[in-house]
Amino acid sequence: MIGRLRGNLLEKQPPELLIEVSGIGYEVQMPMSCFYELPEVGSEAIIYTHYVVREDAQLLYGFNTKNERALFREVIKANGVGPKLGLAILSGMTAAQFVQSVEREDISTLVKLPGVGKKTAERLVVEMKDRLKGWGAGDLFTPATDAAPMDDGSEFITSPQSAVDEAVSALIALGYKPQQASKTVSQVAKPDMTSEVLIRESLKSMI
């Protein structure tokens, strides 16, 4: 079981990163709500991980805190929710927003997430509402999306079009349909936006 990685952040290609620990590079998938908080490429990073073994792959999912990882593990306990959908859920909204939506039984908000239909949203509420009682959203998770610091984008962008393409690819990787991803990014795009900011603004606009 790989539970924690500490090393040099080599690449950031949302929603995936590459971190080098003792000469070994680990590919880690991370919810965008956590990805925004990563340091710049070349810096040291500490990531708490959830390790998944499948017949065809071994996957690592990463988080900035143990509590974010704990929430992810609670999410994937729900019927019909695997790690990929869990990643999309915690990318489409912050951890605090997700907890609030479940507590309020806000099905209409949950179904806006990629891969979450009405039945899945209802299962999330029924199965998780009691388990999430006492989870203080204010001090358990990384800052809400609005408060996330903007990266200078130096490792993300070489031109406006490359930022748009990368943002669209990231949304598709999270489960959004290509047409929806492309349309949403185009609607929020402004000159000189980095791909990270484009992804964040696109996700905000869809919830």
Swiss-Prot record:
The protein's matches in SUPFAM superfamilies, at most eight in alphabetical order, are given as: DNA helicase RuvA subunit, C-terminal domain (SSF46929), Nucleic acid-binding proteins (SSF50249), RuvA domain 2-like (SSF47781)
Q: Which family does it belong to?
A: Belongs to the RuvA family.
Known function: The RuvA-RuvB-RuvC complex processes Holliday junction (HJ) DNA during genetic recombination and DNA repair, while the RuvA-RuvB complex plays an important role in the rescue of blocked DNA replication forks via replication fork reversal (RFR). RuvA specifically binds to HJ cruciform DNA, conferring on it an open structure. The RuvB hexamer acts as an ATP-dependent pump, pulling dsDNA into and through the RuvAB complex. HJ branch migration allows RuvC to scan DNA until it finds its consensus sequence, where it cleaves and resolves the cruciform DNA.
Naturally occurring in which organism (per UniProt): Aliivibrio fischeri (strain MJ11)
**Keywords from the UniProt entry:** Cytoplasm, DNA damage, DNA recombination, DNA repair, DNA-binding
State where the protein is found: Cytoplasm
Q: Mind telling me which Gene3D superfamilies this protein's record contains?
A: 5' to 3' exonuclease, C-terminal subdomain, DNA helicase RuvA subunit, C-terminal domain, Nucleic acid-binding proteins
Write down the InterPro entries for this protein, in alphabetical order.
Answer: DNA_helicase_Holl-junc_RuvA_I, Hlx-hairpin-Hlx_DNA-bd_motif, NA-bd_OB-fold, RuvA, RuvA_2-like, RuvA_C, RuvA_C_sf
Where do the record's region annotations for Domain II lie? 65-143
Record has DNA repair as a keyword = yes
Query: Quick one: where's region Flexible linker?
Result: 144-158
- Oligomer and partners: Homotetramer. Forms an RuvA(8)-RuvB(12)-Holliday junction (HJ) complex. HJ DNA is sandwiched between 2 RuvA tetramers; dsDNA enters through RuvA and exits via RuvB. An RuvB hexamer assembles on each DNA strand where it exits the tetramer. Each RuvB hexamer is contacted by two RuvA subunits (via domain III) on 2 adjacent RuvB subunits; this complex drives branch migration. In the full resolvosome a probable DNA-RuvA(4)-RuvB(12)-RuvC(2) complex forms which resolves the HJ.
* HAMAP family (UniProt xref): DNA_HJ_migration_RuvA
- The record's region (Domain I) falls at 1-64
Q: Name one GO biological process term.
A: DNA repair
Q: What note about domains is in the entry?
A: Has three domains with a flexible linker between the domains II and III and assumes an 'L' shape. Domain III is highly mobile and contacts RuvB.
Q: Which GO terms describe its cellular component?
A: cytoplasm; Holliday junction helicase complex; Holliday junction resolvase complex
Q: What is its main location?
A: cytoplasm
Q: What is this protein called?
A: Holliday junction branch migration complex subunit RuvA
* Molecular function GO labels: ATP binding; four-way junction DNA binding; four-way junction helicase activity
In residue numbers, the region (Domain III) covers 159-207
The UniProt entry, under Pfam families, shows: HHH_5, RuvA_C, RuvA_N
Which CDD domains does UniProt cross-reference here?
UBA_RuvA_C (cd14332)
